[in-house]
Amino acid sequence: MANVVDQSKEQMKKSVESTKENFAGIRTGRANPALLNGIVVEYYGAPTPLKHVATIGVPEPRTLSVTPFDPSQANAVEKALRDSDLGASPRRNGSAILLTMPELTEDRRKEYVKLAKSKAEDGKVAVRNIRRKSKEAIDKAVKDGEMGEDEGDRLLKELDKVTKATTDELDALLEAKQKEIMEV
Protein backbone atom coordinates (compact mmCIF):
# COMPACT_ATOMS: atom_id res chain seq x y z
CA MET A 1 0.00 0.00 0.00
CA ALA A 2 3.02 2.30 0.43
CA ASN A 3 3.06 1.95 -3.34
CA VAL A 4 0.07 4.36 -3.43
CA VAL A 5 2.21 7.16 -1.98
CA ASP A 6 5.02 6.44 -4.47
CA GLN A 7 2.55 6.49 -7.38
CA SER A 8 1.12 9.76 -6.09
CA LYS A 9 4.61 11.24 -5.84
CA GLU A 10 5.30 10.28 -9.49
CA GLN A 11 1.98 11.73 -10.69
CA MET A 12 2.61 14.94 -8.75
CA LYS A 13 6.07 15.24 -10.36
CA LYS A 14 4.39 14.98 -13.77
CA SER A 15 1.97 17.72 -12.74
CA VAL A 16 4.90 19.98 -11.77
CA GLU A 17 6.62 19.25 -15.11
CA SER A 18 3.42 20.06 -16.98
CA THR A 19 3.16 23.37 -15.10
CA LYS A 20 6.79 24.17 -15.98
CA GLU A 21 6.01 23.53 -19.66
CA ASN A 22 2.95 25.77 -19.42
CA PHE A 23 5.07 28.51 -17.83
CA ALA A 24 7.63 28.24 -20.65
CA GLY A 25 4.95 29.29 -23.12
CA ILE A 26 4.18 32.50 -21.21
CA ARG A 27 6.00 35.50 -22.62
CA THR A 28 8.46 37.47 -20.58
CA GLY A 29 10.64 40.37 -21.67
CA ARG A 30 13.15 37.96 -23.22
CA ALA A 31 12.84 35.82 -26.34
CA ASN A 32 12.47 32.12 -25.60
CA PRO A 33 12.12 29.32 -28.20
CA ALA A 34 9.37 27.75 -26.06
CA LEU A 35 7.13 30.68 -27.03
CA LEU A 36 6.81 29.08 -30.46
CA ASN A 37 5.80 25.62 -29.18
CA GLY A 38 2.11 26.07 -29.98
CA ILE A 39 2.62 27.31 -33.54
CA VAL A 40 1.51 25.00 -36.34
CA VAL A 41 2.66 25.41 -39.97
CA GLU A 42 0.82 24.21 -43.09
CA TYR A 43 3.74 22.09 -44.31
CA TYR A 44 3.05 20.49 -47.70
CA GLY A 45 -0.66 20.61 -46.89
CA ALA A 46 -0.39 19.00 -43.46
CA PRO A 47 -0.51 20.92 -40.16
CA THR A 48 2.91 20.38 -38.55
CA PRO A 49 4.42 21.84 -35.34
CA LEU A 50 6.93 24.60 -36.12
CA LYS A 51 9.76 22.86 -34.24
CA HIS A 52 9.46 19.92 -36.69
CA VAL A 53 9.99 22.10 -39.77
CA ALA A 54 12.55 24.68 -38.61
CA THR A 55 15.39 25.38 -36.22
CA ILE A 56 14.74 28.08 -33.65
CA GLY A 57 17.54 30.17 -32.20
CA VAL A 58 17.97 33.24 -30.00
CA PRO A 59 20.59 35.51 -31.64
CA GLU A 60 19.74 38.46 -29.33
CA PRO A 61 17.86 38.72 -26.01
CA ARG A 62 14.64 39.93 -27.66
CA THR A 63 14.95 38.24 -31.06
CA LEU A 64 14.09 34.73 -32.23
CA SER A 65 15.54 33.34 -35.45
CA VAL A 66 13.49 30.70 -37.29
CA THR A 67 15.25 28.87 -40.14
CA PRO A 68 13.08 26.39 -42.08
CA PHE A 69 14.77 23.08 -42.97
CA ASP A 70 13.27 23.45 -46.45
CA PRO A 71 13.80 27.04 -47.69
CA SER A 72 10.87 26.67 -50.12
CA GLN A 73 8.57 26.52 -47.09
CA ALA A 74 9.75 29.87 -45.66
CA ASN A 75 6.53 31.59 -46.80
CA ALA A 76 4.37 29.03 -44.97
CA VAL A 77 6.48 29.41 -41.82
CA GLU A 78 6.33 33.21 -42.05
CA LYS A 79 2.53 33.09 -42.49
CA ALA A 80 2.14 30.86 -39.41
CA LEU A 81 4.28 33.26 -37.37
CA ARG A 82 2.34 36.28 -38.65
CA ASP A 83 -1.01 34.60 -37.80
CA SER A 84 0.12 33.70 -34.27
CA ASP A 85 -0.84 35.84 -31.28
CA LEU A 86 2.76 36.61 -30.25
CA GLY A 87 2.48 40.29 -31.07
CA ALA A 88 5.75 40.16 -33.02
CA SER A 89 6.00 40.81 -36.73
CA PRO A 90 8.28 38.42 -38.63
CA ARG A 91 10.81 39.75 -41.13
CA ARG A 92 12.94 37.83 -43.62
CA ASN A 93 16.70 37.81 -43.40
CA GLY A 94 17.85 35.56 -46.22
CA SER A 95 16.55 32.06 -45.50
CA ALA A 96 15.94 32.91 -41.83
CA ILE A 97 12.89 34.64 -40.39
CA LEU A 98 13.56 37.01 -37.50
CA LEU A 99 10.98 37.75 -34.83
CA THR A 100 11.72 40.74 -32.61
CA MET A 101 9.64 40.57 -29.47
CA PRO A 102 8.13 43.94 -28.57
CA GLU A 103 8.59 45.35 -25.07
CA LEU A 104 5.77 44.29 -22.77
CA THR A 105 3.53 47.05 -21.46
CA GLU A 106 2.65 47.10 -17.76
CA ASP A 107 -0.91 45.97 -18.55
CA ARG A 108 0.34 43.10 -20.70
CA ARG A 109 2.74 42.03 -17.94
CA LYS A 110 -0.16 41.95 -15.47
CA GLU A 111 -2.17 39.81 -17.91
CA TYR A 112 0.73 37.37 -18.16
CA VAL A 113 1.05 37.24 -14.36
CA LYS A 114 -2.66 36.44 -14.16
CA LEU A 115 -2.18 33.71 -16.77
CA ALA A 116 0.77 32.28 -14.80
CA LYS A 117 -1.35 32.22 -11.62
CA SER A 118 -4.06 30.37 -13.52
CA LYS A 119 -1.57 27.77 -14.83
CA ALA A 120 -0.13 27.32 -11.31
CA GLU A 121 -3.64 26.86 -9.90
CA ASP A 122 -4.34 24.22 -12.57
CA GLY A 123 -1.23 22.39 -11.36
CA LYS A 124 -2.36 22.62 -7.73
CA VAL A 125 -5.83 21.32 -8.63
CA ALA A 126 -4.21 18.33 -10.35
CA VAL A 127 -2.07 17.69 -7.23
CA ARG A 128 -5.14 17.89 -4.96
CA ASN A 129 -7.02 15.46 -7.21
CA ILE A 130 -4.11 13.01 -7.06
CA ARG A 131 -4.07 13.34 -3.24
CA ARG A 132 -7.85 12.80 -3.05
CA LYS A 133 -7.71 9.60 -5.15
CA SER A 134 -4.81 8.23 -3.11
CA LYS A 135 -6.56 9.08 0.17
CA GLU A 136 -9.68 7.25 -1.04
CA ALA A 137 -7.56 4.18 -1.91
CA ILE A 138 -5.92 4.22 1.54
CA ASP A 139 -9.27 4.71 3.34
CA LYS A 140 -10.78 1.83 1.34
CA ALA A 141 -7.85 -0.45 2.22
CA VAL A 142 -8.28 0.36 5.93
CA LYS A 143 -12.05 -0.19 5.72
CA ASP A 144 -11.62 -3.52 3.89
CA GLY A 145 -9.10 -4.70 6.48
CA GLU A 146 -6.15 -4.83 4.07
CA MET A 147 -4.17 -2.67 6.51
CA GLY A 148 -4.48 -1.43 10.04
CA GLU A 149 -5.61 2.06 11.02
CA ASP A 150 -2.13 2.97 12.24
CA GLU A 151 -0.62 2.04 8.88
CA GLY A 152 -3.38 4.01 7.10
CA ASP A 153 -2.72 7.07 9.27
CA ARG A 154 1.02 6.82 8.62
CA LEU A 155 0.45 6.64 4.86
CA LEU A 156 -1.97 9.59 4.98
CA LYS A 157 0.62 11.68 6.86
CA GLU A 158 3.26 10.72 4.28
CA LEU A 159 0.82 11.59 1.47
CA ASP A 160 0.12 14.99 3.06
CA LYS A 161 3.86 15.65 3.36
CA VAL A 162 4.37 14.87 -0.36
CA THR A 163 1.35 17.01 -1.29
CA LYS A 164 2.61 19.98 0.76
CA ALA A 165 6.11 19.71 -0.75
CA THR A 166 4.63 19.65 -4.27
CA THR A 167 2.33 22.63 -3.72
CA ASP A 168 5.26 24.54 -2.17
CA GLU A 169 7.32 23.75 -5.28
CA LEU A 170 4.49 25.04 -7.50
CA ASP A 171 4.30 28.23 -5.40
CA ALA A 172 8.06 28.75 -5.79
CA LEU A 173 7.81 28.23 -9.57
CA LEU A 174 4.96 30.75 -9.74
CA GLU A 175 6.88 33.31 -7.70
CA ALA A 176 9.93 32.94 -9.97
CA LYS A 177 7.79 33.26 -13.10
CA GLN A 178 6.03 36.36 -11.74
CA LYS A 179 9.40 37.94 -10.98
CA GLU A 180 10.62 37.08 -14.50
CA ILE A 181 7.48 38.56 -16.12
CA MET A 182 7.54 41.79 -14.10
CA GLU A 183 11.28 42.33 -14.72
CA VAL A 184 11.70 45.34 -17.00
UniProtKB/Swiss-Prot annotation:
PANTHER family: MITOCHONDRIAL RIBOSOME RECYCLING FACTOR PSEUDO 1, RIBOSOME RECYCLING FACTOR
Stated name of the protein: Ribosome-recycling factor
Family: Belongs to the RRF family.
Keywords: Cytoplasm, Protein biosynthesis
UniProt keyword ATP-binding present: no
HAMAP family: RRF
InterPro entries: Ribosome_recyc_fac, Ribosome_recyc_fac_dom, RRF_sf
Name of the encoding gene: frr
Source species taxonomy: Bacteria, Bacillati, Actinomycetota, Actinomycetes, Bifidobacteriales
